[in-house]
Amino acid sequence: MVKPGAHTSALGKAVHDTARKNGLTVIKNLTGHGIGRSIHEKPDHIFNYYSKWDDVKLKDGMVIAFEPFISNNEQEVDQSYDGWTLITEDSFVAQYEHTIIVSEDGPIVVTK
């Protein structure tokens, strides 16, 4: 799934399908992204759900921050008054992140 030529939408579909299978949902207003010399690079987003308009393809050598955000109820988070904390009205949210190098030889997870 993480290989040159693969669509980022396939990652989002896998995250969303896995969440639904387990009675959970995904946070739709937070995404993964490309990473490199800057904290946010191309691709600008890696959704946690499938979008038919998301036709971004992974390229060999690209580095991505894969960040699934899973919730037991809500699909969006809001920013708290402190300008930093993200909150929901009545849900728990979990997030896990891996930095992955896209390679012809297979994905290289660098955050093990």
PLM segments and residue spans:
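Active-site neighborhoods and metal-handling regions in enzymes and metal-associated proteins
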Residues: 1-112
